[in-house]
Amino acid sequence: MNINATDNSLSTPLHHAINLLKTDIVSLLMQYKADASIRDSKGITPFCYAMYLGYYGVNKDILNIITRYNSINGTTRDINDVYTILLNNKKKNYVFVNLHDAARLGYVYILKKIIYNGKNINRIDEYYYSALHYAVKSSNLKAVNF
């Protein structure tokens, strides 16, 4: 059985479990090595959904599960440390967050972390969009004001 099989919207079972707030299923899928970096048809990863839920206080347990299984060498458990590591280490398979994703989602805390760690705020992606483009397009006033 393929734990990372995708449906017609490119969502994996992990995407669905997170969106349905099924903490026990998320934990089980992560134990079986579900990939939290697979993007669905909207370009969003399970880690992104988990972070969104945790950021808005809907369900921090799911975010803790994802970060626990994706911790660096199994030693990093503090969620802020995990954010920093994930944001700055593109070699890890489960990284979804970058400057553009943070701007699109309005994660000002993460934008600050990325920029203060030396990332270029004016960097453009393959679509010639900057972080500001994504913030405006997504109507994230917090990110635009940052």
Curated annotation (Swiss-Prot):
Protein name: Putative ankyrin repeat protein FPV224
Keyword Repeat: yes
Lineage: Viruses, Varidnaviria, Bamfordvirae, Nucleocytoviricota, Pokkesviricetes
Alphabetical UniProt keywords: ANK repeat, Repeat
Matching SMART domains: ANK (SM00248)
Entry-linked SUPFAM superfamilies: Ankyrin repeat (SSF48403)
Stretches forming ANK repeats: 9-38, 42-79, 94-126, 127-145
